[in-house]
């Protein structure tokens, strides 16, 4: 779908399930569709720009509605599995079937239960049937291809034994290796090895004591320049960057407005903060604006005092949906209602934007409009850890108040060097164009892979520019079947079901990489097509008409005069 003539590229298109657009951003303000149409007629549309240039891409996200028959059959499938689960529990109770799962001791029957009834039931009767699809051990670099250690289970997936065989050259469609820096050769590896010889593997101290290396300060200065912010701070763990820093930013008397599909690290951080939490519908600006209005009008519960702070939590790319945050509209609402914005760019930094600077650059926005810019080094940079960027006052405050900064040990020196070298490569400071080529290759792979899957008839979620590609499976039996069939064909994929997704929205999640060649993608697509026919997964009623292959070039992000 393309925007109307004269329309803004950031307009949200109508979803395949019939959901309508929630309005548009025009000149920094949220305007209704009617107002936007009137402005367009008057020739007053102001496009979102990047450094004075026009961002011309349509903002297309597809969330096709689950076909009614598929939804019914999915519920029936869960019903049958539940029925057999109760039957097996009955057999276990009478010692007819061997019991492998953890049970409460009779002596502790009056204690608070360690296991919630439904979760325990789901784990032993549904999850165990397909447990072999997760926690598969690999024994190689997580590049475009990986080696997987083969294992077997003789007790219905309650335990596994290694066979000693190695499945070689499995196409890796599951790792977050977006720019292909997860490798054991090249400049990054050589630089990390050199630093390992000089500094060793660990620091054995916190930053505030004797664990603050010159490499750490070099990294933080580089991250700040990369993001276009005043200062930045690096942390040893991406998950802890969220969960340990949010409590330092807000507390009792503050309000957190969180997207309903935010990552578990954001959810945990919000809960640990002690602030009041309210949830808005995923990427829905009407829902967010209503919560903002209510927060200002009604204030805190009981006392009706104004909130000390209102913090909006969003992600750049949502890792289960493949959707991209509607950042221009979030920023417009944040400014309008004087809230703060916390942006998690774990999946979007390096993967979006003409030069890989994330969702802020993708929309051509000013980094200063985002109060807290968070991201991780675990994905596009092929390393570990996370960062927070923003104003110098913010970073100075976090250095003394963040649990992750004060109590956690510092990043490993070779890991720091891996991040520095890969980031300089992306920025072009290594004297080559390799980084830019990787960003371009990822964008090309993303659009090609998504388009081909839609042409085959699969239901694909998310934004067309997102390298996270969810393929909907729906039925519980097809979760395990898809993962096993793909591995038989030497394709490693991630399959996801409840409770990580809604109960009828099980899916396979592909993560694309700049390391994937067209031959690798074509091989994977061929096998996906065959498995899709075998398992009858082609549910889409909006199959795309195949197009001629068109190369991805710089005109995709063409800058023009307004």
Curated annotation (Swiss-Prot):
PROSITE patterns: AA_TRANSFER_CLASS_2 (PS00599). Induction: Expression at protein level is highly increased in brains of patients with Alzheimer disease. No changes are observed at mRNA level. The modification N6-(pyridoxal phosphate)lysine is found at residue 379. Changing residue 176 to A: Loss of catalytic activity with L-serine and palmitoyl-CoA as substrates. One of its GO terms (molecular function) is pyridoxal phosphate binding. Disulfide bonds: none annotated. It comes from the Eukaryota. CDD domains: KBL_like. The chain crosses the membrane at residues 67-87. Changing residue 379 to A: Loss of catalytic activity with L-serine and palmitoyl-CoA as substrates. Changing residue 122 to A: Decreased catalytic activity with L-serine and palmitoyl-CoA as substrates. Does not affect the negative regulation by OMRDL3 and ceramides. It is a single-pass membrane protein. It catalyses: L-serine + hexadecanoyl-CoA + H(+) = 3-oxosphinganine + CO2 + CoA; octadecanoyl-CoA + L-serine + H(+) = 3-oxoeicosasphinganine + CO2 + CoA. Widely expressed. InterPro entries: Aminotrans_II_pyridoxalP_BS, Aminotransferase_I/II_large, AON_synthase_class-II, PyrdxlP-dep_Trfase, PyrdxlP-dep_Trfase_major, PyrdxlP-dep_Trfase_small. SPT complex catalytic activity is negatively regulated by ORMDL proteins, including ORMDL3, in the presence of ceramides. This mechanism allows to maintain ceramide levels at sufficient concentrations for the production of complex sphingolipids, but which prevents the accumulation of ceramides to levels that trigger apoptosis. Changing residue 382 to V: In HSAN1C; complete loss of normal activity as measured by lack of formation of sphinganine; affects enzymatic affinity resulting in the accumulation of the alternative metabolite 1-deoxy-sphinganine. It is found in: Endoplasmic reticulum membrane. Component of the serine palmitoyltransferase (SPT) complex, which is composed of SPTLC1, SPTLC2 or SPTLC3 and SPTSSA or SPTSSB. The heterodimer consisting of SPTLC1 and SPTLC2/SPTLC3 forms the catalytic core of the enzyme, while SPTSSA or SPTSSB subunits determine substrate specificity. SPT also interacts with ORMDL proteins, especially ORMDL3, which negatively regulate SPT activity in the presence of ceramides. Forms dimers of heterodimers with SPTLC1. Component of the serine palmitoyltransferase multisubunit enzyme (SPT) that catalyzes the initial and rate-limiting step in sphingolipid biosynthesis by condensing L-serine and activated acyl-CoA (most commonly palmitoyl-CoA) to form long-chain bases. The SPT complex is composed of SPTLC1, SPTLC2 or SPTLC3 and SPTSSA or SPTSSB. Within this complex, the heterodimer consisting of SPTLC1 and SPTLC2/SPTLC3 forms the catalytic core. The composition of the serine palmitoyltransferase (SPT) complex determines the substrate preference. This is Serine palmitoyltransferase 2. It comes from Homo sapiens.
């Amino acid at each position: 779908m393309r925007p109307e003539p004269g329309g803004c590229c950031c307009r949200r298109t109508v979803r395949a399930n019939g959901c309508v657009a929630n309005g548009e951003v025009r000149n920094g303000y949220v305007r209704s569709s009617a107002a936007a149409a009137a402005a367009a007629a008057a020739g007053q549309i102001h496009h979102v720009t990047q450094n004075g240039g026009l961002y011309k891409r349509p903002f297309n996200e597809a969330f096709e509605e689950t076909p009614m028959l598929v939804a019914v059959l999915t519920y029936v499938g869960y019903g049958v599995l539940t029925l057999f689960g109760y039957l097996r529990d009955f057999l276990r109770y009478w010692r007819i079937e061997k019991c492998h799962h953890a049970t409460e001791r009779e002596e502790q029957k009056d204690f608070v239960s360690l296991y919630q009834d439904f979760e325990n039931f789901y784990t032993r009767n549904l999850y165990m049937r397909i447990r072999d699809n997760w926690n598969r051990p690999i024994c190689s670099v997580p590049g475009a291809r990986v080696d997987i250690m083969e294992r077997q289970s003789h007790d219905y997936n309650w335990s596994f034994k290694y066979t000693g065989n190695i499945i070689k050259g499995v196409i890796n469609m599951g790792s977050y290796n977006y720019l292909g820096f997860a490798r054991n050769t090249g400049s990054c590896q050589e630089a990390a090895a050199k630093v390992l010889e000089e500094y060793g593997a660990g620091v054995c101290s916190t930053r505030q004591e004797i664990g603050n290396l010159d490499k750490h300060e070099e990294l933080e200065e580089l991250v700040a320049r990369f993001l276009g912010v005043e200062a930045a701070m690096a942390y040893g763990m991406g998950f802890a960057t969220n969960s340990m820093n949010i409590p330092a930013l807000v507390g009792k008397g503050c309000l957190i407005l969180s997207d309903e599909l935010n990552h578990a690290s954001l959810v945990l951080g919000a809960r640990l903060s002690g602030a009041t939490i309210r949830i808005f519908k995923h990427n829905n600006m009407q829902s967010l604006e209503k919560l903002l209005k209510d927060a200002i009008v009604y204030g805190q519960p009981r006392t009706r005092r104004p909130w000390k702070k209102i913090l909006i939590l969003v992600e750049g790319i949502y890792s289960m949906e493949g959707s991209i945050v509607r950042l221009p509209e979030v920023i417009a609402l944040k400014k309008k209602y004087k809230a703060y914005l916390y942006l998690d760019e774990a999946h979007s930094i390096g993967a979006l934007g003409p030069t890989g600077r994330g969702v802020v650059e993708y929309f051509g926005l000013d980094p200063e409009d985002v109060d807290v810019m968070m991201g991780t080094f675990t994905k596009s940079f092929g390393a570990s850890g996370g960062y927070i960027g923003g104003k110098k006052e913010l970073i100075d405050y976090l250095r003394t108040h963040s649990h992750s900064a004060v109590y956690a040990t510092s990043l490993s020196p070779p890991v720091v060097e891996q991040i520095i070298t890969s980031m300089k490569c992306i920025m072009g400071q290594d004297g080559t164009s390799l980084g830019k080529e990787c960003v371009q290759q990822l964008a090309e792979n993303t659009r090609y892979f998504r388009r081909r899957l839609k042409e085959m008839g699969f239901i694909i979620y998310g934004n067309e520019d997102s390298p996270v590609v969810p393929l909907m499976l729906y039925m519980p039996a097809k979760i395990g079947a898809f993962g096993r069939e793909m591995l038989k064909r030497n394709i490693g994929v991630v399959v996801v079901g409840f409770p990580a997704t809604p109960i009828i929205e099980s899916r396979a999640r592909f993560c694309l990489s700049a390391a994937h060649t067209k031959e690798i993608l074509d091989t994977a697509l061929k096998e996906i097509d065959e498995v899709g026919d075998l398992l009858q997964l082609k549910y889409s009623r909006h199959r795309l008409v195949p197009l001629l292959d068109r190369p991805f070039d710089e005109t995709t992000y063409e800058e023009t005069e307004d």
